[in-house]
Amino acid sequence: MKRIEAYTDGACSGNPGPGGWGALLRWNGNEKELKGGEAETTNNRMELMAAISALSALKEPCEVDLYTDSVYVRDGISGWIEGWKRNGWKTAAKKPVKNAELWQALDEARKAHKVTWHWIKGHAGHPENERADELARAGMEPFKYAGHRTLKVK
């Protein structure tokens, strides 16, 4: 199985407001950068989109070390999601899970792979995380002055 390092980040101006996501994939000395954004979104949605996009870009089953600076993504995928699925996508307080469609997409995207989730402190000088942040901000840029639409930028 191919081993991949994925560094993901999301950004949002306004929260809600225009947002972007970025991902840096590394394997065997190769790199691939991904980015995209939306006109009206939240930082948590963009963090999820970054992870979904990174895993969905892989064309074959891989061993993935996925690095995120989002405690929301790390805690959700490493713990909360199993309870949400058991509870019909409701929280322990019986409220609908926020961003359920994205959590479901992330759950689906990870199935083909062996993913190890890592949390890293954001904006702490970690070069790959800083690059993912730059990609997320670049993915947001077209939406800062645009109408409500979605654009995937490669």
Curated annotation (Swiss-Prot):
Keywords: Cytoplasm, Endonuclease, Hydrolase, Magnesium, Metal-binding, Nuclease
InterPro entries per record: RNase_H, RNaseH-like_sf, RNaseH_domain, RNaseH_sf, RNaseHI
Annotated RNase H type-1 domain residues: 1-141
Domain of life according to the entry: Bacteria
The record's free-text note on cofactor binding: Binds 1 Mg(2+) ion per subunit. May bind a second metal ion at a regulatory site, or after substrate binding.
Gene3D superfamilies with a match to the protein in the record: Ribonuclease H-like superfamily/Ribonuclease H
Binding site for Mg(2+) 2: D9, D133
EC primary class: hydrolase
Catalysis: reaction(s): Endonucleolytic cleavage to 5'-phosphomonoester
Location relative to the cell: Cytoplasm
Task of the protein: Endonuclease that specifically degrades the RNA of RNA-DNA hybrids.
Protein's name according to its UniProt entry: Ribonuclease H
Organism: Brucella abortus (strain 2308)
